[in-house]
Amino acid sequence: SDLVVKYVSARNKSKKRKVKIPKNKWLKNYLEASKREDIDIVIELIGGSDGPAKKLVFNSIKNKKHVITANKALISKHGDELSKLAEKNRVNLEFEAAVAGGVPIIRVIKEGLTTNTISKIYGILNGTCNYILSEMENSKDSFLNVLKKAQNLGYAEPGGAKFDLDGSDALA
């Protein structure tokens, strides 16, 4: 069946966007997504391990909504609890985009390697650092200039990319 975007929410509804969003698609409050009967899947892109993102994801799962998130901080801090809650409520919690710079590895590990024991995984675990290092090498530009470019492109957190750059992101 086709994917239909029923509603959207954002901190700043008046922000200029590349797509036009009809007024009737905007939710008055982001938590409405977790309660509405006509919503099956909630996609969380808020960010942060607590606050609005945590509230939305927990409420959605409790209300039997499938959840998709790219939120590393949330999964790192609350992943075990969220997974158990999703299993209890018989819904999916999908977070592949939150891991290893978006490399599609979670499903392979969960479904394809269940009888094997994984002791180590080597690879690029942080897409932001990978982008910055590759761009510095290719463009010969400075770290600060490339970081600013990464922030403008949305690859690094604006204002303070500490989580992206100090290793805690990859540790998550």
Question: How would you name each of these model-derived features?
Answer:
Residues 63-66, 127:
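Glycine-enriched alpha-helix->loop->beta-strand junction motifs that scaffold or abut catalytic
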Residues 26-28, 43-44, 68-70, 93-97, ...:
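General beta-strand structural signal in soluble alpha/beta enzymes
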Residues 4, 29, 38, 52-56, ...:
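General structural feature for long, well-ordered alpha-helical segments within catalytic domains
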Residues 1-63:
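N-terminal glycine-/serine-/threonine-rich beta1-alpha1-beta2 phosphate-ribose binding loop
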Residues 46-63, 70-110:
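Rossmann-fold NAD(P)-binding glycine/threonine-rich loop
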Residues 111-171:
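Conserved anion/nucleotide-ligand pocket segment
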Residues 1, 12-16, 34, 50, ...:
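Structural signal for hydrophobic packing residues in well-ordered secondary-structure cores
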